């Protein structure tokens, strides 16, 4: 696998230690990201944490702030911007590094980090794609504005169900997992 990712800087703080990576996309998330990363530290025994940063200026995702908390920091230096570009960089990196699967979550503190072991379990069981949901039994969301919740539940999800023929409960959720096979499938 070659690295077809947009231009970026890579800061590797230690070697790969797990078959799965947790990729967190951030851009000036500040204290929300700092609190989320602290909550994720206990999971470093299960996954390598990779930060995909859009060249934030808030300092929360600087190399000095992260060097003892994550495996790798990837900083987008390309003219292309947006969360999808950050994930392209991180997924290409994860494939080059040989990870068996990748779990993605946004760095805004809105995803329930306690579900991370379930994602790892499902990847180990052979699932190729796992989609998080804030709206299923046991689902969780924090700090999501009510107009966004209503729009997702009663506008976007029904449209996605109709278009895809699949019973999505939260197609907008950025908390998802993918196997290596899924990522490499043309």
Residue ranges and their predicted role:
Residues 78-96, 113-186:
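Acceptor/aglycone-binding surface of glycosyltransferases and processive sugar-polymer synthases
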Residues 53-62, 109:
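A conserved acidic beta->alpha catalytic loop
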Residues 19-21, 48:
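Cell-envelope/extracellular polymer assembly enzymes that use nucleotide-activated donors
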Residues 31-34, 58, 85, 170:
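Residue-level preference for short helical/loop micro-motifs built around acidic side chains
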Residues 20, 72, 100, 128:
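Conserved acidic residues
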